[in-house]
Amino acid sequence: MESFILQLLKPIIAFLESLTLDEQKKFAALLSVFVVSLTFLTSIFAKKKSNPIALPLDGKTAIRLPLERIVQLSKDTKLLRFTLPTKEHAFGLPTGSHVMVQLTDAKTGEKHMRPYTPVSSDALDKGHVDFVVKVYFPNKQFPEGGKVSQMLDAVKVGEDTVEFFGPLGGKRYVGEGEFTVKKLKSQGGGVERRDARDEVGMIAGGSGITPMLQIVREMLRETGAGGQSPKKISILYANKSEEDILCRDTLDNFEKQFPGRVKVWYTVDAASKKKEWKYDVGFITKEMIEKHLPTPAKSGDRFQILVCGPPPMMKFAVNPAFEKLEIGKEHVLTW
């Protein structure tokens, strides 16, 4: 190998020996300029390549995207993938915020809107954006079902487009276990910072898991890039049945890939296979929160609990439990 390298270097050495001392100095100076310039251009190219192009989401103008793919997750839940303008584009949504999805009724011309949070990541998923949609079909309690979810269920791949408005919501995950909350004018305005460097707890009910997935993915992406906070992520996820658990494979993989750091616990109204079900049964209780999530008594002050679920879950289960455990509003972020 050494002799091979010497053979390659011989013409270069001969060329340098043929130069005068002044010529050698000039050549060395030119070579150093070339190397510095090449390094600079390479770094610029690398930055451009690593930074995706964000969509111009301004909260007012609709972004129209075509449906690319449908993945059936359960009997009433789908993953919808929408195509972005190029493979280098990212959706451009800050972590923790959401968008308003708008569709037009073909028969009446009436527009219908509903908030959704993507489960894909701008940093990890270029060229597309993914949404998990639970379709609310008509039933005895709600004869019309969910209008927007049924309209999304009818969208066809390669034929239809959907309008998106955003970003919306005043809460952001800004990295390294820190959140910001936009304060209302009545509260004096400005931005409040929340410290969750030690632990983040999450309570989700049904489709309320989607904003949690977005945030967890970003936190774990930071870990891969050398981030250390938050030190622990605990998720308590409630559903009607085991079959209704959305993105369970993804959640279980988080726990497997980051043992000791990510903990996922489920509770269902009724377990179809009681002998095989190792988690809880019933509504979320004070005891579940105390056992699986951070509290002031065991976690100190640097934690936040993120909550997203139906109003009855909040009113009759979560809020009373928080009060008993003395978990104040300063430690709770609700989506």
Where are these regions (language model features)?
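Histidine-anchored nucleotide/phosphate-binding helix
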Residues: 118, 209-226
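Gly/Ser/Thr-rich loops at beta-strand to alpha-helix junctions
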Residues: 206-211, 310-313
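A short, basic/flexible loop-to-alpha-helix module at the beginning of a structural domain
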Residues: 168-195
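Short helix-loop-beta connector
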Residues: 193-198, 299-301
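Transmembrane-helix exit/juxtamembrane "anchor" motif
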Residues: 37-57
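Reductase modules of NAD(P)H-dependent flavoproteins
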Residues: 2-40, 232-335
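Ferredoxin-reductase
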Residues: 52-165, 239-241, 252, 267-271
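Conserved beta-strand elements of the Class I
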Residues: 199-203, 304-306
